[in-house]
Amino acid sequence: MCTLANRSFAKMNGIGNEIVVLDLRDDPVAVTAAAARAIASQVPYDQLMVLQPPRAAGTAAFIRIYNNDGSESNACGNGMRCVAKQVFSGTDASALAFESRAGLLQCWRGAAPDIYTVDMGVPKFGWQDIPLAEEFRDTRMIELQIGPIDAPLLHTPSAVSMGNPHAIFWVDDVHAHDLGRFGPLLENHPIFPERANITLAHIVDRTHIVIRTWERGVGLTKACGSAACATAVAAVRLKRAERQVQISLPGGDLTIDWREADDHVLMTGGASFEFEGTLDPALFAGAA
């Protein structure tokens, strides 16, 4: 039987992003895609954050990130704030470092309770890095549309990698389009060989942007931290926003600061604890 049986987990929330944190640092075991899907059947989540023993010196853990369809992701900003809250609760440190498949991540306690800042790293804009299936010299706006050629419903998104691929469509009203219908079509468009997170973004002013996101491997979500980061940097590249902006998502607000000194993207927002539980052994009979 899979040794995940009876392991403790924490159910958490990152401004509407449903997160499960599974701390395996003291007794590590591999988590398969089937096991990740099985866990989602007991406690529904958007992302499963698995803490494994640290690999790099000075880090608190190596983080594996799973979507609820069992696929693995390189980045989840809202999930990282939840991880930070859990790990900070056992220490008086003001800063912690973690490692993921995307590299090293720094986290800090915020000025207010349950507020945390995560360094999401440096965004990538090269078509090979996002990645895209075709060469685009300028990924600030790529050739992609939904709808008739002469009257497209959505068109010319910005493309960005924040450790995972994002496409941001600029619209006047994020609620005027059926993202539940178009999201899966765009997520799986051939232009995105690794699929993509699809975001609708409305620029209110140079310091405030409203977004909705269809999250790769998840679907419609109340919050996607990496999408907020991708939107902020894409707007700056288009000269339509300042380097520090407020991003409003259905689940709440995030502050994104694209630091000019080193191009790192800092994301600040809330994380909350909901409940603890143990994994049902019956889930893993066929998921080992």
From Swiss-Prot:
Its EC number is 5.1.1.7. The keyword Amino-acid biosynthesis applies. Gene3D superfamilies: Diaminopimelate Epimerase, Chain A, domain 1. Catalyzes the stereoinversion of LL-2,6-diaminopimelate (L,L-DAP) to meso-diaminopimelate (meso-DAP), a precursor of L-lysine and an essential component of the bacterial peptidoglycan. This is Diaminopimelate epimerase. Coiled coil: none annotated. The active site is at C76 (proton donor), C224 (proton acceptor). GO terms for molecular function: diaminopimelate epimerase activity. It is found in: Cytoplasm. InterPro entries: DAP_epimerase_AS (IPR018510), DAP_epimerase_DapF (IPR001653). The record marks H166, E215 as: Could be important to modulate the pK values of the two catalytic cysteine residues. It comes from the Bacteria. One of its GO terms (cellular component) is cytosol. The keyword Translocase does not apply. It catalyses: (2S,6S)-2,6-diaminopimelate = meso-2,6-diaminopimelate. PANTHER family: DIAMINOPIMELATE EPIMERASE (PTHR31689:SF0), DIAMINOPIMELATE EPIMERASE, CHLOROPLASTIC (PTHR31689). Pathway: Amino-acid biosynthesis; L-lysine biosynthesis via DAP pathway; DL-2,6-diaminopimelate from LL-2,6-diaminopimelate: step 1/1. It is an enzyme of class 5 (isomerase). Homodimer. Transmembrane segments: none annotated.
